[in-house]
Regions:
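Acidic, Mg2+-coordinating active-site segments of isoprenoid diphosphate-utilizing enzymes
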Residues: 72-86, 148-154
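His-Asp-centered metal-binding catalytic motifs of divalent-metal-dependent phosphohydrolases/nucleases
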Residues: 61-80, 100, 104, 123-129, ...
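Helix-adjacent hinge/juxtasegments
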Residues: 80-123
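Acidic catalytic motifs of isoprenoid enzymes
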Residues: 23-30, 34, 75
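Divalent metal-dependent phosphate-bond-processing catalytic cores, especially two-metal-ion Mg2+/Mn2+ enzymes
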Residues: 3-18, 22, 35-42, 46, ...
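A ubiquitous short alpha-helical element
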Residues: 32-36, 87-93, 133-134
């Protein structure tokens, strides 16, 4: 809890966050942080939450909840379960969006949230009102910043340069000026710095 934020019901809010974290801690794929393996989707949710609160210390209850469940249990529908084509990728992403929203809705209902709040969280997860809604822009900035800070180096190491540059340009195009300012402060490796420069220079 940060800024002057007060959840509508602190017990319900904390219960929902705890349940999201419990689910994501079941991720069998881990990532080492300071030499300690952490469940990947749990880690992703913590990083996304951190960026949302850094960008918007007074973030709304629905935005905080959405940040914590954006990729809820993503490992349950692996990429390999769809054809390894562009169409297969888009189909996989569309299925995942609905899957995350449904699972998040189940947990929010279990926590005692009303359908109206559940709908607002799911709309953020599904990017339904992006970019019109300010909260959706904060979440998108946070998603892009997690990518730039924690995933860019891995992508650059296994992807053709033009595809990485394209991914960077797409991310940059979705970000607000505030998000871009934070992105330029990140500590990039030499290769990633050069790729970002290339992407921004078009």
């Amino acid at each position: 809890v940060s800024g002057s934020f007060q959840p509508s019901d602190p017990q319900r809010f904390e219960f929902a966050l705890r349940r999201f974290d419990e689910e994501n801690r079941r991720d069998p794929t881990t990532e080492a942080v300071a030499g300690v393996p952490q469940p990947r989707e749990w880690l992703y949710a913590q990083r996304l939450t951190k960026w949302v609160l850094q960008l918007s210390p007074d973030a709304s209850e629905e935005l905080r909840l959405a940040a914590r469940c954006q990729h809820l249990c993503r490992w349950e529908i692996p990429r390999q379960s769809y054809p390894m084509t562009r169409a297969g990728y888009l189909q996989w992403r569309a299925t995942l969006k609905k899957f995350h929203a449904r699972k998040a809705g189940d947990i929010l209902r279990e926590a005692g949230y009303a359908d109206e709040m559940i709908g607002r969280v799911q709309d953020l997860n599904l990017k339904k009102n992006f970019p019109a809604e300010p909260a959706s822009r904060v979440l998108e900035d946070a998603l892009c910043l997690v990518f730039l800070e924690f995933q860019l180096a891995d992508l650059a190491g296994k992807t053709a340069e033009d595809k990485t540059v394209n991914a960077l340009q797409k991310s940059w195009g979705k970000m607000t000026e505030a998000g871009r300012a934070e992105a330029l402060k990140l500590n990039y490796g030499e290769r990633e710095k050069a790729l970002l420069q290339h992407a921004l220079n078009g």
